[in-house]
Every structure is written in C-alpha cells, then in structure tokens.
Amino acid sequence: RTGTKLFNTALAASGLVIASVDFRLAPDHSYPAQVEDVSYAIRWLKAHASEFKASPDSIGGAGASSGGHTLMLAAMRPDDPRYTVLSSPDVEGHDGTFAYAIAEFPVLDSYARYQYAISDGYDRLVASTNNYFLNEDAMQEGNPQGILDRDEDADLPPLLILQGTADLNIPMSIPRAFAQSYRIAGGDVELEEFPEMPHRFIEEASDATDKALELAKAFVARQLAT
C-alpha cells in the first residue's frame, strides 16, 4: 500500500479518486484470502461510490508485484464463489467487476515464476510462493495465465501492464506470454516495457516513472471516455 504511494498520489493529483486497499498477507494468510479481500473491497467501493463522488461503473483497479497477481485474479473471476465469501448488507447487489486494470510488474504466471525462481536460485521467491499457495495445485489453480490456458470463462477488462525489462523477479517471457494469451482470449491489453528498469521501479522518481504515470493517466482517461 505504501510502496506505490508516489505513483498513486500523482494519479490522485490528476483528478482520480484513489482508494488504497489493505489485504491479508502470507504467511499468516494463504491464498485465496488476499483475493477475497480485494473482491470485497471492489464491491464495497461500488456500494459507497457516491460518497467519493465516483461512479460505480467507472471503478478500476491497480496492483503491483504480488498485488498485481491478486488484482488479476479478482478482475478475471469477479463472481467466483471462492473469492466472494466476504459480504455485508451494504455490498449486496453489487458485483466485483472492474472497469479496467493496471498491473505493475505483476506475477501473471505464478507457476512459471515459481519454476524460474527455483532454477535461478531465488530462495526468497521460492519461500514466499510456497507460503502464499502452500502447494502446487493451488499455484496452478490461482494462476492468471492458467485461467487463459484452460480457456476458463473469464472476465477480461481493459488491461495496462507496466513492466521493467531488468526485473529479476519477473522474467519478460511471463508478461509477454500473458499479453498474447489475453489478446487471443478477446481482451484488450497494452504491455508497456521499460528498458533497464528493475522490479518496483515506479516507487522511485525517474523519467521511467514519469512515463509510466502518463501512460496510466492516458489509459484510464480512455476507459472512462467509453
């Protein structure tokens, strides 16, 4: 929530209503707790949109790194009963669909990223993935790329992916493959690559961060204009 404060504050300054969502984290809470929280948050925001002078139909989402993974699962499976278990009277009648999504250096293929971490000796990523999913069956099931590969009936909101090419956490093959699969499935996706930028590059002020911000603002403006 605080890591992308610089980026989100700049988006808010452009006139967008920004809500920063907390969700449960591993290892204390394994998958799908994180997606449950985000699913509830989008429904709560729709229920209370008028309080923020926002329209329920214009609410999108953004997520960075593992938050991008959580975002995409919530966006692609807005009505999945595994994710909609949290409820309250005020959210009844509101769905979990997203008008658009912005995924910042996201984990779009959790299983492929796990195999990459093992092969390259990234023990921290291996451990965090195991803590998150607990087993490889869950890793395959809770996998945005897997949803597309299995030809599941998925929601495909307009999507902007922001990815640095020097990201040691995310090999470029993953976002490139996902973008191709998303298009084939009928989704509208823009993959923007930032040469020599590392993981979480938008957390620091730079020309690349400025460019990413302008791309994000233009992307949202296009979605709200339709």
Please place each PLM-identified region on the residue numbering:
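Short amphipathic alpha-helix adjacent to the substrate-entry channel of hydrolases
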Residues: 2-20
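Alpha/beta-hydrolase active-site loop
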Residues: 29-51
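Primarily recognizes the serine-hydrolase "nucleophile elbow" in alpha/beta-hydrolase
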Residues: 43-116
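Mobile cap/lid helix-loop segments that gate and shape the active-site cleft of serine hydrolases
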Residues: 76, 83-84, 88, 112-150
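Short beta-strand/loop motif that positions the catalytic acidic residue
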Residues: 155, 160-163, 167
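Conserved alpha/beta-hydrolase "acid-adjacent" motif
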Residues: 168-177
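Catalytic histidine-centered segment of alpha/beta-hydrolase-like enzymes
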Residues: 197-209
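Catalytic active-site module of serine/aspartate enzymes centered on a nucleophile-bearing elbow/loop
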Residues: 207-226
